[in-house]
């Protein structure tokens, strides 16, 4: 009898441990105000007439672009951006970047985590990417609610480039604005430790972009955003080395403010802070006012 009780006790101890472990590994829920609080030391929040409350980083140069201070790695969710900037855990995985004619690059908060939010271009010699601006239609199409922003126009070309959701899947028609793109030689992509330093100089982008094709391939599978883009085997052939596939694991117990590396790599595991963001119809600005998003 005692042995049976002991066995039952051990069973429930193990079971409770598994439950606690699963709870510890589950994503936490936080309010979208988290972005305001944690990004304020690194940049300013301002109201935008079209996008609501937007954020702009301090201490970046006049020629800075998003997705340059870091590197690309292959993961179970496709290509993931490993940022070296202390605010990169938020701005490259949630929300979208937009180039504003008056403000420059601004970031719009979002609620869905992804390995990166970029469009991809590829040619035999080069691989490039460009930040994806917000587009309501695209997110509804793949089952993700982003926000109620209007479709965005880039006004830097003779023809306006409107981001309909079809373009994210069409490999031939969509061409991103040249000034927003970053290109790496294909033999350097996937293993160079600093994408911005290995990038092709801007004056060559027009020719490179003209000779490339769109390979953007974003999917929503099992409640996760998958960022495929450049073919993994093509990258391995060009670089002559096998890619490491990183497992993405939730990291919930983190100190955000003052941390240089919120997300960390250990072996083949990439520990990321990616809480589920709860939407709020109002978000604070730096002047402590509120306005509808």
Which residues fall in each region the model found?
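Low-complexity segments
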Residues: 28-287
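Classical secretory targeting signals
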Residues: 1-27, 290-293
